[in-house]
């Protein structure tokens, strides 16, 4: 009897079993990704880099706060990887045709000959970056595309940090990640062998470090900012000029934001030492950076030149607006900026690429309005952060617009600044809907009135029959 009355114990597997299950599940997921390393040994480095690119996203702690956010981030981390595989093994996607082929061809030549291009700036810097990878790990088309995917996923992580900083500590939402990560032009160009993923990454990181300096000025953060600004400016002359202006802003913040006399003296000494050669280098490179140079002509085969001419004839999102009305004299700057930001206009849409460019411009315009709204509604340090990020955005876009004459190139030039624009724009929309007063309907709610009348009658009858009162019925 006593044995029958003994409560039944619920047997639970030990924690080690759960650990083994997790290990088994992780092995099931990773094994198919590691298999190509054995099957395609010439691309082993590319496959490992793709795994590292995916690990950047799934192991980023803020993305693991909840399942919807984690699944969204994991999906967005897989998209550049999938596009890199398509570009490497199946077909060349739009955005990675002419320029990407030229970069690959030149990088392979440099890795074999050791004839490094000079100066190490702009396209030459990117060719050297690819050639260095080829010299260490061997020539591989997948490796070149995998490095772009790695830069794109690292940019996703930096975007999350930037949004959190701009929004005052808010957690990024899945829809915010989707708006940032699924922009068609950014997706296609970041998965190709192009400079765009690295331009976007280092521009966003430079803005992020600038905001950290505005919050708490530290010398270590300032040196990290210098490294990021240098990495941002090395890819293109427009970005080098932008980095120079941001460096001036950071120096001004350092002089204003510290009470230490010794630190102010140190910043005052460092600024001329850093800015003078940086300004000379940036302006010199900007004046010297004129397309198409003899090196570029040599890089493109005759077939590539023919393809460029075909694209120019058929549009393909690259129609020129250089001869639009008002594009002469002093008026060229504001009018050129408007065309750079808005073109193609609705009546200029001639194909699907133009339609995509039009829709992206409308999205960017809405995000710009949201950014201005964020500045108007925010206060204190948050408003300072928005002002700095908005200044960086307008500076780089104004510099880009001065040297851009077709909306196909403009579509690529919008990519580096899209991270700060997206973060500010979405934060501004959230502030607007949070501050907007609730509008009351003019028509009375009949059902609510009936319910109110019923409750009033019930409470009146309850008062009449309460203790101490007399029931007149």
What are these regions (language model features)?
Residues 24-30, 77, 224, 381-402:
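Transmembrane alpha-helix segments characteristic
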Residues 237, 241-360, 459:
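Alpha-helical transmembrane segments and terminal signal-anchor/GPI-anchor hydrophobic tails
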Residues 90-106, 116-129, 138-139, 330-334, ...:
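Extracytoplasmic catalytic/substrate-binding loops of multi-pass membrane glycan-assembly enzymes
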Residues 191-197:
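Short acidic/glycine- and proline-prone juxtamembrane loop motifs at membrane-interface regions
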Residues 32-36, 187-188, 209-213, 221-243:
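Membrane-interface alpha helices of multi-pass inner-membrane proteins
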Residues 159-182:
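Transmembrane-helix signature of polytopic, membrane-embedded enzymes
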Residues 165-166, 171, 212, 216-220, ...:
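Membrane-interface helix-loop-helix junctions at transmembrane boundaries of multi-pass membrane enzymes
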Residues 57-61, 146-167, 366-370:
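Transmembrane-helix motifs of polytopic, lipid-linked glycan transferases
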């Amino acid at each position: 009897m006593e044995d029958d009355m003994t409560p039944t114990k619920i047997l639970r597997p030990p924690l080690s079993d759960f650990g083994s299950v997790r290990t088994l599940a992780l092995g099931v997921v990773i094994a198919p990704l590691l298999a190509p390393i054995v099957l395609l040994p010439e691309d082993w480095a590319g496959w490992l880099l793709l795994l590292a690119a995916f690990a950047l996203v799934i192991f980023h702690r803020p993305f693991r706060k909840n399942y919807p956010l984690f699944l969204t981030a994991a999906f967005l981390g897989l998209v550049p990887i999938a596009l890199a595989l398509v570009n490497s093994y199946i077909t060349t996607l739009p955005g990675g045709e002419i320029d990407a082929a030229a970069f690959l061809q030149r990088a392979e030549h440099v890795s074999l000959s050791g004839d490094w291009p000079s100066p190490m700036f702009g396209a030459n810097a990117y060719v050297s970056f690819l050639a260095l990878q080829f010299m260490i790990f061997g020539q591989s088309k997948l490796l070149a595309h995998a490095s772009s995917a790695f830069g794109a996923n690292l940019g996703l992580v930096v975007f999350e940090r930037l949004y959190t900083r701009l929004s005052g500590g808010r957690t990024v939402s899945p829809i915010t990640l989707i708006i940032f990560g699924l922009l068609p032009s950014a997706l296609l160009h970041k998965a190709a062998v192009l400079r765009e993923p690295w331009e976007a990454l280092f521009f966003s990181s430079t803005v992020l470090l600038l905001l950290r300096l505005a919050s708490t000025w530290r010398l270590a953060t300032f040196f990290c900012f210098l490294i990021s600004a240098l990495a941002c400016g090395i890819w293109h002359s427009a970005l080098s000029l932008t980095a120079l202006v941001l460096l001036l802003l950071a120096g001004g913040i350092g002089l204003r934001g510290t009470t230490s006399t010794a630190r102010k003296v140190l910043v005052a000494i460092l600024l001329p030492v850093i800015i003078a050669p940086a300004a000379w280098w940036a302006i010199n490179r900007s004046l010297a950076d004129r397309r198409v140079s003899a090196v570029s002509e040599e890089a493109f085969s005759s077939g590539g030149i023919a393809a460029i001419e075909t694209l120019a004839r058929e549009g393909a999102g690259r129609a020129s607006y250089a001869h639009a009305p008002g594009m002469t004299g002093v008026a060229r700057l504001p009018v050129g900026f408007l065309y750079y930001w808005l073109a193609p206009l609705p009546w200029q849409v001639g194909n699907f690429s133009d339609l995509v460019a039009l829709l992206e411009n409308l999205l960017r315009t809405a995000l710009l309005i949201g950014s201005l709204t964020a500045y108007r509604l925010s206060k204190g340090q948050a408003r300072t952060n928005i002002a700095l990020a908005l200044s960086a955005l307008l500076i780089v876009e104004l510099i880009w617009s001065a040297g851009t004459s077709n909306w196909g190139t403009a579509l690529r030039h919008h990519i580096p600044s899209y991270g700060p624009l997206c973060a500010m724009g979405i934060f501004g929309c959230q502030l607007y809907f949070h501050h907007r007063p609730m509008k009351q309907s003019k028509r009375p709610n009949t059902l609510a009135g009936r319910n109110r009348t019923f409750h009033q009658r019930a409470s009146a009858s309850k008062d009449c029959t309460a203790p101490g009162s007399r029931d007149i019925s």
